[in-house]
């Protein structure tokens, strides 16, 4: 057994427990029972003093160790093929070393820690049993894929995780042939896996398809749509429900309390994967499709009997969807996982199988086990103490400012309510929840439901604020159109993480919200240029009660402008922008926080004898027509600047200018938008350079359009 080269304080260290013996094919059934044990037995950590330090415990001197742990077995594993001859005992050692490696790497890069630690044994078992990449393994969301990446040829690049030109934080098809499906958003893998399974069948292939889903993803309707279709199509595939108590149907509430019973549950699950019982059910299943009458009823009873024998939980939900259910299974028991996966792989059967694995988020790292929410996504941290190294700032995040503004509105108006889709921390609404517990609604990862739920609240005279990340708003677009905008219901959309988002990359980039929201006929579309403006736009949205509205704001902190007194914003005049700096020849019309880059660009240009006009549009819809006319008629060049895709704010300005005849004369218009491609993950600074949205890029555009190419080159190189 390998030991993690990390140490933890005595008050949270694990008790030493004997390691289970290797799986013996000849062992009796009764020998597999551990009466009274918990399904999630404590990790088998113990003090082991060796020459290079103390591992997995507090040292005698009270010192902690945070250097890279020794991983002699993992060092020999570059790809899954290298695991095939390992014994179960060695697989356990590999799991321990893999967990240590994940902790060490994430401590240096930041990233998703808890989810990855929770699937270490499952990852090892999957790659041991199945033959990837021929067999397909899909990781839903993908933030638990770090152990998978380490075992599939990318260990030497883990130090680049989520960094510019480094490994992605999720699975990515272009990164490795072992990443058969790209992820980042939740609840997609059963659908994609089913498509792969049906495609395999149509092509006459024999490979396996495994979809791993959980960690909140089972709260989304798509997962159930896919399971329903999988049961109907009856193609062979394996669905692994990674139940870490953050799914819609956790073990404790699936059909009432179902307490895990440790090795007893493991033994029952091993029995449940017994081939004769499975094949008995398949016979009955086939018969019921071909005959009727009394014989049909008999066959149905055989199927019911087999299913009852097999389903240890007593739940028929998954079976009613047409899935063959096995579980619950201890997701940290290599013996059981390997045995069950091999049985399922080798059994001649037809149709989808669901294996219900019970796992612990943050497994093997006490700090993450005790505070799963705080160690889901982490900054760089000290492995020995769990302390995260978060940057200091004199300002708060836009997310926090939004939450404070909404609390202020709710204090003044009892009809203000808040909705989020399993992102209470990410959207800041946990702050709202603490103040107004009966007026805040977490609907799970169910953005479609969140939007229509908000529409229903609006129908009853409430003032719903639906806080959803910009990229996740994409998942509820039909609801935004059909259930909200078409009916002119006053739902307020607070779209966080607008624009580039850094390490989370293109899956979470909020590039498209202005484009897809501003084309809706009844929608008011706004964006604040700073945190004070955000307070005013929250107040504006609260005051708009005859139609829907939305506002976007970025990841990151405010710029330090004075805030409204008492955190209470003042409603803005709808469709009115403002001029911040009066200049000549060239006007920069910024939208959202891009206004700050416009101001910085104006400062770069001024030493060259050119004073620019800088305006803050505030609204994309309705546009400030008077402001645009003024800027177009009094300047040679109008440049619109936004941190969004083609078809957004600039396109709406161009549409108006063209129809108003403002482009028929000498006035030139130039748009600066995100390029028509996905911006890869990296540091925010690198992403802005890649996108061409830095102040020097804006300044260079000014000089180029004026024909001053030398100045343009100079401003880009200084």
Swiss-Prot record:
Gene Ontology biological process: 1-deoxy-D-xylulose 5-phosphate biosynthetic process; chlorophyll biosynthetic process; glyceraldehyde-3-phosphate metabolic process; terpenoid biosynthetic process; thiamine biosynthetic process
Binding-site residues for Mg(2+), renumbered to this chain: 215, 244
Record note on cofactor: Binds 1 Mg(2+) ion per subunit. Binds 1 thiamine pyrophosphate per subunit.
Catalytic activity: D-glyceraldehyde 3-phosphate + pyruvate + H(+) = 1-deoxy-D-xylulose 5-phosphate + CO2
Cofactor(s) of this protein: Mg(2+); thiamine diphosphate
Keywords attached to this entry: Chloroplast, Isoprene biosynthesis, Magnesium, Metal-binding, Plastid, Thiamine biosynthesis, Thiamine pyrophosphate, Transferase, Transit peptide
Database matches in Gene3D superfamilies: 3.40.50.920, 3.40.50.970
Subcellular location: Plastid, Chloroplast
Enzyme Commission designation: 2.2.1.7
Spans through the membrane: none
GO cellular component: chloroplast
Molecular functions per Gene Ontology: 1-deoxy-D-xylulose-5-phosphate synthase activity; metal ion binding
Keyword Magnesium attributed: yes
Reported tissue expression: Expressed in trichomes, leaves, flowers, roots and stems.
Keyword Magnesium: yes
Superkingdom field: Eukaryota
Residue range covered by the transit peptide: 1-55
Binding-site residues, thiamine diphosphate: 143, 184-186, 216-217, 244, 365, 447
Pathway annotation from the record: Metabolic intermediate biosynthesis; 1-deoxy-D-xylulose 5-phosphate biosynthesis; 1-deoxy-D-xylulose 5-phosphate from D-glyceraldehyde 3-phosphate and pyruvate: step 1/1
HAMAP family: DXP_synth (MF_00315)
Family statement: Belongs to the transketolase family. DXPS subfamily.
Primary role: Catalyzes the acyloin condensation reaction between C atoms 2 and 3 of pyruvate and glyceraldehyde 3-phosphate to yield 1-deoxy-D-xylulose-5-phosphate (DXP).
Subunit composition and interactions: Homodimer.
The name this protein goes by in its record: 1-deoxy-D-xylulose-5-phosphate synthase 1, chloroplastic
Species lineage: Eukaryota, Viridiplantae, Streptophyta, Embryophyta, Tracheophyta
Gene from which this protein is expressed: DXS1
């Amino acid at each position: 057994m390998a030991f993690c080269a990390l140490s933890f304080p005595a008050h949270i260290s694990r008790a030493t427990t004997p390691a289970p013996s290797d799986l013996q094919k000849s062992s009796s059934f009764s020998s597999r029972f551990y009466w009274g044990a918990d399904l999630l037995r404590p990790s088998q950590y113990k003090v082991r003093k060796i020459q290079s330090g103390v591992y997995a415990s507090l040292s005698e001197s009270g010192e902690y160790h945070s250097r890279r742990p020794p991983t002699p077995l993992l060092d020999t594993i570059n790809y899954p093929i290298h695991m095939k001859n390992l014994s179960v005992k060695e697989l356990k050692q590999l799991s321990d070393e893999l967990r240590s490696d994940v902790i060490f790497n994430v401590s240096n890069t930041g990233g998703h820690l808890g989810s990855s630690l929770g699937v270490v044994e499952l990852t090892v078992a999957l790659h041991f049993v199945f033959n990837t990449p021929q067999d397909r393994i899909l990781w839903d969301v993908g933030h638990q894929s770090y152990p998978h990446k380490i075992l599939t040829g990318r260990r030497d690049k883990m130090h680049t995780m989520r960094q510019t030109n480094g490994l992605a934080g999720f699975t990515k098809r272009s990164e490795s042939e072992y990443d058969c499906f790209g992820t980042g958003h939740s609840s997609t893998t059963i659908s994609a896996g089913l498509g792969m399974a049906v495609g395999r069948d149509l092509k006459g292939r024999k490979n396996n398809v495994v979809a791993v889903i959980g960690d909140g993803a089972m709260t989304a309707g798509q997962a159930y749509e896919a399971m329903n279709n999988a049961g109907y199509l009856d193609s062979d595939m394996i669905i692994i429900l990674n139940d870490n108590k953050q799914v819609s149907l956790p073990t404790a509430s699936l059909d009432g309390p179902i307490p895990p019973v440790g090795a007893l549950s493991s033994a029952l699950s091993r029995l449940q994967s017994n081939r004769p019982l499975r094949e008995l059910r398949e016979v009955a299943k086939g018969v019921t499709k071909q005959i009727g009458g009394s014989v049909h009823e008999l066959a149905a009873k055989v199927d019911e009997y087999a299913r009852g024998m097999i389903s240890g939980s007593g739940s028929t939900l998954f079976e009613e969807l047409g899935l063959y259910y096995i579980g619950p299974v201890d997701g940290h028991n290599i013996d059981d996982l390997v045995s069950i996966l091999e049985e399922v792989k080798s059994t001649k059967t037809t149709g989808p199988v669901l294996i219900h694995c019970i796992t612990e988020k943050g497994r093997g790292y006490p700090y993450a086990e005790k505070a799963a929410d705080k160690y889901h996504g982490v900054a760089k941290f000290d492995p020995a103490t769990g302390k995260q190294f978060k940057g200091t700032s004199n300002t708060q995040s836009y997310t926090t400012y939004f939450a404070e503004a909404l609390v202020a509105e709710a204090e003044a108006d009892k009809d203000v309510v808040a909705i989020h889709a399993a992102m209470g921390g990410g959207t800041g609404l946990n702050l709202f929840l603490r103040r107004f517990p009966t007026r805040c609604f977490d609907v799970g990862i169910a953005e479609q439901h969140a939007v229509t739920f908000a529409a229903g609240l609006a129908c009853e005279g409430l003032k719903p604020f639906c806080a959803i990340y910009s990229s996740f708003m994409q998942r509820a677009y039909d609801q935004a159109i059909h259930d909200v905008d078409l009916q002119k219901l006053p739902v307020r959309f607070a779209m966080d993480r607008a624009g580039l988002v850094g390490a989370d990359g293109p899956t979470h980039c909020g590039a498209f919200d202005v484009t897809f929201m501003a084309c809706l006929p009844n929608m008011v579309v706004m964006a604040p240029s700073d945190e004070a403006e955000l307070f005013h736009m929250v107040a504006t949205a609260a005051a708009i009660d005859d139609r829907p509205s939305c506002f976007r704001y970025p990841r990151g902190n405010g710029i330090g402008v004075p805030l409204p007194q008492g955190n209470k914003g003042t409603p803005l005049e709808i469709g009115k922008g403002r001029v911040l700096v009066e200049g000549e020849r060239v006007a920069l019309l910024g939208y959202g926080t891009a206004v700050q880059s416009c101001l910085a660009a104006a400062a770069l240009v001024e030493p060259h004898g050119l004073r620019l006009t800088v305006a803050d549009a505030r609204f994309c819809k309705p546009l400030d027509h008077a402001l645009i006319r003024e800027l177009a008629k009094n300047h040679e060049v109008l440049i619109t600047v936004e941190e969004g895709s083609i078809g957004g704010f600039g396109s709406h300005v161009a549409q108006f200018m063209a129809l108003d005849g403002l482009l028929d004369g000498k006035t030139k218009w130039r748009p600066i938008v995100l390029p028509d491609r996905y911006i890869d993950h990296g540091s925010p600074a690198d992403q802005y350079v890649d996108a061409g949205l830095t102040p020097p890029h804006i300044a260079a555009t000014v000089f180029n359009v004026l024909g001053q190419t030398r100045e343009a080159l100079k401003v880009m190189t200084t």
